[in-house]
């Protein structure tokens, strides 16, 4: 997923790239909301999100159970490494997510199925992979569903293959993806108790502001922040990214 910093960095290329970046932002879905750990350091340097631990599983669960303006929500935690199947290997990140992540990112399982809530509860060693992963780990064209791939010596059984999305407007391969239950990545791959982010979709684009207000209230309460305390998390919306893009490119022209 393109980050805010990536958006702004790419803007240095100039006005010519504005259209392609705008297209990528719109590809995320106009209702998308991204929550990251750590205070908003707009204009400054943000700490590496993986080093910040202010977003916990309890935060995701509270948002999932209490919000009124979200249609889907998923934790996000990822681990980078080498995928191995037989004599084939490929560098990739395993993204730990929930079942609703497909709806948020507008992904579809084409072969097999998405992992289940039961898989999440049991931290099952299962995964869903994109076409690029299939092509590199199973170049003989065999069906990967049911096969075992290894990541950091952990065996993961492939239960589904995502429908191809190809390259996005910025040349990023959207099929080089591996999805696994977030519990599996947290417990078996990283041994952490915190999240790198939470992704959500508002019920409608018009309800995005209501959703972010609600998210802010719940997280501040969960984190026991006083009225004078700054947020120890950052919320970004697709609409906000578009606004940031427009204002930044306008300054440069």
Please provide the spans of the model-predicted regions.
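Hydrophobic, regular-secondary-structure patches
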Residues: 15-93, 97-103, 135-136, 186-187, ...
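Residues embedded in well-ordered beta-strands within globular domains across many folds
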Residues: 34, 71-74, 160, 199, ...
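Short, flexible, glycine-rich and Lys/Arg-enriched loop motifs at helix boundaries
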Residues: 40-50, 220-232, 236
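Residue-level detector of beta-strand face positions
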Residues: 82, 146-150, 234
């Amino acid at each position: 997923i393109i980050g805010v910093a990536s958006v702004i960095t790419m803007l240095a290329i100039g006005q010519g790239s504005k259209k392609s970046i705008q297209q990528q932002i719109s590809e995320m879905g106009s209702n998308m909301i991204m929550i990251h750990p750590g205070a908003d350091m707009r204009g400054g340097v943000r700490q590496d999100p993986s080093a910040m631990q202010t977003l916990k599983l309890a935060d995701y669960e509270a948002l999932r159970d209490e919000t009124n303006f979200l249609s889907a929500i998923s934790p996000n935690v990822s681990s980078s490494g080498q995928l191995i199947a037989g004599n084939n290997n490929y560098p990739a990140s395993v993204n730990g997510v929930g079942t609703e992540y497909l709806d948020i990112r507008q992904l579809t399982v084409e072969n097999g199925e998405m992992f289940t809530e039961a898989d999440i509860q049991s931290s099952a060693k299962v995964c869903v992979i994109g076409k690029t992963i299939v092509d590199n780990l199973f170049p003989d064209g065999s069906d990967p569903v049911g096969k075992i791939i290894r990541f950091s010596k952990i065996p993961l059984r492939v239960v589904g293959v995502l429908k191809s999305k190809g390259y996005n407007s910025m040349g990023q391969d959207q099929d080089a993806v591996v999805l696994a239950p977030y519990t599996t990545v947290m417990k078996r791959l990283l041994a952490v108790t915190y999240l790198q982010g939470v992704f959500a979709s508002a019920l409608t684009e018009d309800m995005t502001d209501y959703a972010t207000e609600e998210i802010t209230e719940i997280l501040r309460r969960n984190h026991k922040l006083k009225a004078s305390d700054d947020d120890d998390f950052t919320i970004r919306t697709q609409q906000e990214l578009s606004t940031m893009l427009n204002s930044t490119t306008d300054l440069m022209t």
